[in-house]
Regions:
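Membrane-interface elements of multi-pass transporters and channels
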Residues: 50, 118-121, 165-173, 201-204, ...
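Interfacial helix-loop-helix junctions of multi-pass membrane proteins
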Residues: 164, 241-251, 278, 285-294
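Hydrophobic alpha-helical transmembrane segments and immediately flanking/interface helices
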Residues: 166-187, 245-273
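Residue-level signature of transmembrane alpha-helical entry/exit and packing/kink sites
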Residues: 29, 33, 97-101, 140, ...
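Selective transmembrane alpha-helices of multi-pass membrane proteins
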Residues: 26-38, 172-197, 276-296
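Acidic, low-complexity central loop/insert segments
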Residues: 134-165
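Functional transmembrane helices that embed catalytic/metal-coordinating motifs
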Residues: 99-126, 146-155, 193-218, 222-269
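Histidine-/acidic- and/or cysteine-rich, low-complexity loops and terminal segments associated
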Residues: 2-106, 130-133, 171-176, 201-216, ...
Length: 296
């Protein structure tokens, strides 16, 4: 029965579409990723609108966000937004605020970094499809995606802890506000210098050439593929972690800068050479120098 081919002609249109998705792991994975990215952007956008309602106009796009309608949302999302947008660390329910900040940063990672992992995931799907055509076992691509996202979930813990540290030591008015003076300049300086480093280039090369890595580490064991996803996530983190520091200089809930960083990482991983990295690094260093001069 499993070897028979079915055209699902007795199902309605929706049923045939669902059967087609279920039969094609590649399509199912791409749909899952697409929905996840859209959902992450929706939640971040809704949170940014809520944050703009109670903040003075200052950051780019604040006026636009203030004029956008605030959508009615379920109560659990309102509570999640309130924990993330609290002006300072909460003394009472602080135990819930820390996981909320981790989830906020993880949503940023899904929104900005998962699209740039599309070549990796697409390449794995192609290899898996070829293996199945030959009758060989292949681990579902979502196992690879889960490993990749697990790396960014771990990184989100670090970024959320850094959020609390920056608020405590950088003198920001509110917890997610831009880091001012030396703290903001330091974030830009580190991000800018890293764009010229050999480690950045080594990680970028791994992200740009997923086929050789996947082919050399191919396995039919889910644990091995999950670990492969973790490793590829580490390479991506090594490539992009410094860019995430820019969010501390512009404000963690600045969705316009989120989109710009996501677009840059997508372009950087699809191109060759170091031009994009060096241009970005130069801009960040000039920006850091300007911020230092202004705050002096």
């Amino acid at each position: 029965m499993s070897g028979e081919q079915h055209d699902f002609s007795h199902l309605d249109r929706a049923g045939r579409a669902a059967a087609g998705v279920a039969r094609s792991p590649r399509l199912a994975v791409m749909l899952t990723i697409g929905i996840s990215v859209v959902l992450a952007w929706f939640l971040l956008g809704a949170m940014a609108i809520r944050g703009a309602e109670s903040s003075p106009v200052g950051a780019p796009g604040d006026m636009l966000l203030k004029n956008l309608p605030s959508l009615p949302l379920p109560g659990f999302l309102d509570r999640f937004f309130a924990l993330c947008l609290a002006p300072a660390p909460l003394a009472g329910p602080a135990g819930m605020q820390a996981p909320a900040l981790v989830l906020m940063w993880f949503l940023m990672a899904v929104a900005t970094m998962l699209p740039s992992a599309a070549p990796l995931i697409r390449t794995y799907c192609e290899i898996a499809d070829t293996a199945r055509i030959k009758g060989e076992p292949a681990v579902h691509p979502l196992v690879l995606v889960a490993g990749y996202l697990a790396t960014w979930l771990g990184a989100s813990v670090g970024f959320s802890a850094l959020t609390l540290a920056v608020y405590a030591f950088a003198g920001s008015g509110r917890m997610l506000d831009p880091a001012i003076d030396i703290a903001g300049a330091a974030a830009l300086l580190v991000a800018g210098l890293y764009q010229f480093s050999g480690l950045k280039q080594a990680c970028l090369d791994k992200c740009r050439n997923p086929f050789s890595v996947l082919f050399a580490n191919w396995s039919a064991k889910p644990g091995r593929i999950f670990r492969l996803g973790l490793e590829q996530g580490v390479w991506c983190l090594g490539c992009c972690w410094a860019l995430m520091l820019v969010m501390f200089a512009v404000g963690a809930m600045n969705v316009f800068w989120m989109a710009l960083i996501g677009l840059f990482t997508l372009i950087e991983k699809q191109t060759t050479g170091r031009v994009a990295s060096r241009v970005a690094g130069t801009i960040l260093l000039v920006w850091a120098a300007g911020l230092l001069l202004v705050s002096a």
